[in-house]
Amino acid sequence: MAIAEEPAQAPVIQRIALVIQYLGQGFCGWQRQPRQRSVQGELESAIAAVVGHPVSVQSAGRTDTGVHAAAQVAHFETTSPIPAHRWPSVLNGRLTPDLNIRAAAIVPANWHARFSASYRRYRYTIYTDPCPNLFLNSYVWHYYQAPLCENQMQAALQTLVGYHHLAAFQRSGSKRQHAWVHVQDAWVRRRDSLIEIEVQASGFLYGMIRLLVGLLVQVGEGSRSLESFTDIWVNQRRDRVRHAAPPQGLCLLRIGYPDSPFPVDAWFDTQPLFVLPSSRNDSESLSPCAVSLG
């Protein structure tokens, strides 16, 4: 009597979430584009080479050409048994130095990098010293043509906090059905020659931060009043927002989730060194003469 074979078990599908860093100048942006180098395309190729089947990598947000990410989040599905903690080292061995996996986690099947997120946080950095800095050029907008008043810029930016219709800060070509944005937090601060502009929102419009920064600089230099700034976005005068800040000063800092699947230390050491707090006194004390070699 023949023994019936047990049916083969279907492979288990796992959804893997990643924390990703990249330098934007080498990519056409996040989204896959024909015959162009994209972050999504590079990741999908690297993952497919590891697991042996095509994958679709979905992100929390689509950064534009030249925009950096300190902690982008994305997910993909696979039947590979590779444990979550090994994914960073496995993928980083196949990726180029301008694209890096910081952390990975197994998430539920209904978890989505984009739709499960509660906020995105961006930082834009402006360098105001007249002398260029070769170590900053690729990560800041070098703007020195006029002095900028960060207090005026802060006053203008604060008018956006809340739930507002911000069509004035949306580039043409957007597929979004509406222009309502919940800005949760926003501030401007100066550290020596660096002016940092941070905005946190539930979501962002296409090109929003760069258009916003371009207008804030006009407020900071005094060529546009606070009243004019407010009138532009309240009355949706998109035709008056003519200049977008360059992409290299913009960095996606973090994606927030109600129940983050990543350990707390996954977010450590994810920001460029020049934006980390430092003490001028400490740096001045580190002269070669003060170092003992004996």
Swiss-Prot record:
Gene3D superfamilies: Pseudouridine synthase I, catalytic domain, C-terminal subdomain, Pseudouridine synthase I, catalytic domain, N-terminal subdomain. The keyword Isomerase applies. Substrate binds at Y122. Keywords: Isomerase, tRNA processing. It comes from the Bacteria. Its EC number is 5.4.99.12. It is an enzyme of class 5 (isomerase). The active site is at D64. It catalyses: uridine(38/39/40) in tRNA = pseudouridine(38/39/40) in tRNA. It holds the Pfam family PseudoU_synth_1. One of its GO terms (molecular function) is tRNA pseudouridine(38-40) synthase activity. One of its GO terms (biological process) is tRNA pseudouridine synthesis. Belongs to the tRNA pseudouridine synthase TruA family. Homodimer. Formation of pseudouridine at positions 38, 39 and 40 in the anticodon stem and loop of transfer RNAs. This is tRNA pseudouridine synthase A.
